[in-house]
């Protein structure tokens, strides 16, 4: 029960609920920058001709009651103007007189909670471009070289390596006519998505299906000696997604998980240090420990 959770010294949640722990600020607090990003005369929707200044190089938080204009300011005015000026996007921003300071940035990255994909074929590994590295790694295994397997052999979207009965889905749809369709595990591959020959190729004792069933944290241990793979896995862990399975279907992820996947993808890319990150309610639904991880990035 709640009282036991709060009093338990071994419970992370209890530590936060009791006040023994909390989301910490960075011990080395950054000094405000001389440069600022300034929105002039924002007047769209509920905004009433306001000027807003954001210090460059710091974490800025926009908060307020529902309907106060937070989303209008950040998403409709700032994000759309930045997308237009930095990326030539054809977006019409909300009414305002101008934005000063965008010259301090060379790109704008907007990270929201919209789904990363409706298809069950999309997963964390494919979204952050990790699956490409894994397929290449499996194609370099000794058995793959003997058999002439290419990275495409380890894609469940292509004929050759996938199970042809379920077409790489791992599930088979049963038409129930007047009832909703039912999906059952493929009898041929037992849900593994690949054919027997492909699953005979192993990396450190694991085949490709077993790797996709691993959590991100477990995979980090397996690929310790492969820097390019490990870097992506560690970035996923840094945003608090170490518990997700590499092959977990995208349509089973929450909005917060989708948002952190997007953030991980952006952080794993080469950056110039001049990116403007716009996060829409990044802590919604997160445990305090995950909020701390987000703050520590």
Task: Place the predicted regions along the sequence by residue.
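Conserved phosphate-binding elements of NTP-dependent enzyme cores
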Residues: 1-297
């Amino acid at each position: 029960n709640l009282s036991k959770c709060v009093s338990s010294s071994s419970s992370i949640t209890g530590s936060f609920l009791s006040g023994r722990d909390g989301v910490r600020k960075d011990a080395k607090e950054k000094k405000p920058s001389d440069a600022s990003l300034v929105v002039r005369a924002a007047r769209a929707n509920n905004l009433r001709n306001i000027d807003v200044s954001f210090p460059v190089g710091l974490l800025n938080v926009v908060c307020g009651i529902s309907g106060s204009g937070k989303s209008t300011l950040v998403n409709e005015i700032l994000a759309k103007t930045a997308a237009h000026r930095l990326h030539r996007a054809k977006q019409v921003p909300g009414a305002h007189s101008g934005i000063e300071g965008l010259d301090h940035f060379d790109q704008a990255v907007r990270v929201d909670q919209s789904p990363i994909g409706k298809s069950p074929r999309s997963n964390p590994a494919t979204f952050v471009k990790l699956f490409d590295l894994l397929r290449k790694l499996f194609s370099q295994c000794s058995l793959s070289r003997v058999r002439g397997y290419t990275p495409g052999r380890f894609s469940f979207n292509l004929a050759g390596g996938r199970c042809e009965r379920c077409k790489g889905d791992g599930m088979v749809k049963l038409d129930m006519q007047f009832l909703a369709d039912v999906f059952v595990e493929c009898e041929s591959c037992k849900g593994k998505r690949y054919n027997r020959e492909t699953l005979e190729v192993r990396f450190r004792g694991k085949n490709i299906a077993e790797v996709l069933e691993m959590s991100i944290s477990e995979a980090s241990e397996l690929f310790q000696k492969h820097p390019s793979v490990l870097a992506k896995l560690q970035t996923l862990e840094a945003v608090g997604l170490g518990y997700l399975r590499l092959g977990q279907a995208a349509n089973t992820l929450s909005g917060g998980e989708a948002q952190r996947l997007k953030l991980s993808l952006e952080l794993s890319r080469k950056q110039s240090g001049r990116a403007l990150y716009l996060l829409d309610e990044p802590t919604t639904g997160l445990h305090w420990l995950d909020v701390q991880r987000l703050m520590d990035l």
